[in-house]
């Protein structure tokens, strides 16, 4: 009997009905799947019936068990199994996969946000279905005006639609986690940057992330006050007036398109200011 290791954030899901619901939610056109944290291999087994799968397991003991359990699938090329930290592998040349892939995972809660953000930024990742803490799931899947709407919600919705599919009862895990878990799905339909992308290049995308960090720095304060720490307040007030936005708006009350528009205007204002300064 394998015991879950706390330092790896392990909670093994073995409920067949829940595992089947995850498989059924994967888009029909997916060919390659990347799985992070296969654990005992219950989800891996189901994935391998349909998809070529690449799995990353950080726990060496579990890796050895999986290597034996799926020896045939590894031999015939249906499964690529690595004993590696997926977060570290993301930073390596080639990332998690040399091909386009769909991410499916029961993510450790302590690294879930970081992993989802990596997947969002990874151009080879076509989307994801992951199980995470419900509190985090709500932040990624929230819509404008929801109290949970955040910078994470905006980043998740830029390329497609992020939705919370269903909750998973703690008693379906071994050991049971102390929090409710939820499964979210993100299917990308747009490119983040490039010729047909939302942003011109990676530098502009990073600037937008910094803009969002400023916007949501203090969720209880007004958006105008938050942004004023990084941008000229008078210029912002003019932007708000031209867009018919109330100056007492809280960060969660503005929609994604309006955030993009304010960012674009402030970026253009900054570029004009730099050009004027270079001419003096």
From Swiss-Prot:
Chain positions recorded as S-adenosyl-L-methionine binding sites: 11, 13, 37, 57, 85, 106
Location(s), subcellular: Cytoplasm
Entry similarity comment: Belongs to the class I-like SAM-binding methyltransferase superfamily. rRNA adenine N(6)-methyltransferase family. RsmA subfamily.
PANTHER family on file: DIMETHYLADENOSINE TRANSFERASE (PTHR11727), DIMETHYLADENOSINE TRANSFERASE-RELATED (PTHR11727:SF7)
Protein name: Ribosomal RNA small subunit methyltransferase A
Pfam families for this protein: RrnaAD
EC id: 2.1.1.182
Any one GO MF annotation of this record: RNA binding
Catalysed reaction equations from the record: adenosine(1518)/adenosine(1519) in 16S rRNA + 4 S-adenosyl-L-methionine = N(6)-dimethyladenosine(1518)/N(6)-dimethyladenosine(1519) in 16S rRNA + 4 S-adenosyl-L-homocysteine + 4 H(+)
Main function: Specifically dimethylates two adjacent adenosines (A1518 and A1519) in the loop of a conserved hairpin near the 3'-end of 16S rRNA in the 30S particle. May play a critical role in biogenesis of 30S subunits.
Gene Ontology cellular component list: cytosol
Species whose genome carries this gene: Campylobacter concisus (strain 13826)
Major subcellular site: cytoplasm
HAMAP family: 16SrRNA_methyltr_A
SUPFAM superfamilies (alphabetical): S-adenosyl-L-methionine-dependent methyltransferases
Keywords: Cytoplasm, Methyltransferase, RNA-binding, rRNA processing, S-adenosyl-L-methionine, Transferase
Gene3D superfamilies named among the record's database cross-references: Ribosomal RNA adenine dimethylase-like, domain 2, Vaccinia Virus protein VP39
Name of the top EC class for this enzyme: transferase
